[in-house]
Regions:
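Right-hand nucleic-acid polymerase module
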Residues: 1-75, 81-165, 172-190, 199-206, ...
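Short glycine-enriched loop/turn motifs at secondary-structure junctions
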Residues: 78-79, 222
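Catalytic palm active-site di-aspartate
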Residues: 138-142, 189, 193, 215-230
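Alpha-helix N-cap/helix-initiation sites
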Residues: 164-167, 219
Length: 347
């Protein structure tokens, strides 16, 4: 007969001389975690010795120093750059473990209005509820990840049922010093940050959902992009009303990106048009077709030389754009892919 982990734990604990009271406390603690389908972690030593074997020498140190991250910038689709903090491999492994073994086990806590970084949801599912609206409000959360402090992350792990030292250690692994808020916060680039950000925006989502329900509006959020829409001819809420709720939850709106659009103007949600269906913007599709045309007519190398681009990078960049179009509009994307495959990339 196979023995349960409880019986093995009790036997080992008694051999180590622990009291009945201590053993029962441990079993009660473990039952809360197992009920939520979470790994049982009694203390930091247990985590490092049992779950993170082989990463023990580095796990505690690398989450405390700046050299544990490589900082770089990527160009945004609009103006400016996005700063990325990529963890070194050891720290990244630990963060992936937290992501897969803890965070993904409680993803059902997220509302159906949340579409970013959730399996089977996307910018397309985020845009779909807003199709054929009379008006749309777009609001962007400023410095989203930097706004989520280690204290909030610590409280989240405590709420899951983990004891103090384990929660503090996990929150250290998932945060770093922010040059925006001058405190430890979620780094943009850590595997754990997207889901943690979602969990720590749940209360904001609840209040915004309540507002939407009261005023017969639609609400969705994709990461830091908040969208409201409705079928009423007149919008029943102002951006300021929404921004006030955002401030109450410790976030800040990026006012330069706040937009309210009415039917007849171009209505967009997370980069997609939603006038009479979800579509890739016409300008985007035209640019892809233009690049395909010149690459096929003059050859990729000549075209890249003219636009001062590297051929290898250009090929991947163009294919990425085609696959994006295909993910939203399969027919249009497939036609683009056929042209792409007809180009002589050896030229």
């Amino acid at each position: 007969m196979e023995r349960t982990w409880e019986s093995l734990f009790i036997e080992e604990a008694k051999l180590l001389g622990h009291s009945e009271e201590y053993i029962q406390l441990c079993l009660d603690y473990a039952s809360i975690l197992k009920k939520n389908n979470l790994p049982v972690i009694f203390d930091v030593e247990h985590l490092l010795d049992y779950y993170w074997t082989g990463h023990f020498p580095w796990a505690n140190a690398c989450c405390r120093f700046d050299w544990a991250y490589k900082d770089y910038k990527i160009r945004k689709k609009t103006r400016g750059f996005r700063e990325i903090s990529a963890p070194i491999p050891t720290l990244k492994w630990c963060q992936h473990w937290i992501q897969h073994n803890i965070l993904e086990h409680v993803v059902d806590r997220l509302s159906s209005s949340v579409h970013g970084f959730v399996q089977n949801r996307s910018i397309q599912t985020n845009a779909l509820p807003h199709v054929n609206s009379e008006w749309i409000i777009n609001i962007d959360l400023k410095d989203y990840f930097d706004s989520i402090s280690q204290k909030k992350v610590l409280d989240f792990f405590l709420q899951l049922g983990y004891e103090d030292s384990v929660s503090e250690f996990l929150s250290n692994v998932c945060t770093r010093f922010s040059r925006v808020t001058y405190q430890r916060a979620l780094p943009q680039g850590a595997p754990t940050s997207p889901l943690l950000a979602n969990f720590l925006t749940i209360n904001l989502d609840k209040d915004l959902e309540r507002l939407a329900e009261e005023l017969d509006m639609r609400y969705t959020r994709y990461a830091d992009d908040i969208t409201f829409s409705g079928v009423q001819k007149t919008c029943p809420v102002t951006p300021r009303d929404i921004e006030n709720i955002i401030y109450e939850h410790g976030f800040r709106p990026n006012k330069s990106k706040t937009r309210i659009r009415y039917k007849g103007s171009r209505m967009m949600v997370t980069g997609l048009t939603v006038g009479n269906g979800v579509h890739v913007p016409k300008e985007y599709r035209k640019q892809v077709l233009r690049e395909l045309h010149f690459a096929k007519k003059y050859g990729p190398e000549n075209h890249c030389r003219k636009v001062r681009n590297e051929k290898g990078y250009f090929r991947e960049w163009l294919l990425g754009r085609i696959m994006f179009v295909r993910s939203i509009d399969k027919e249009a994307g497939t036609r683009m892919l056929e042209i792409f495959n007809d180009i002589n990339w050896m030229m």
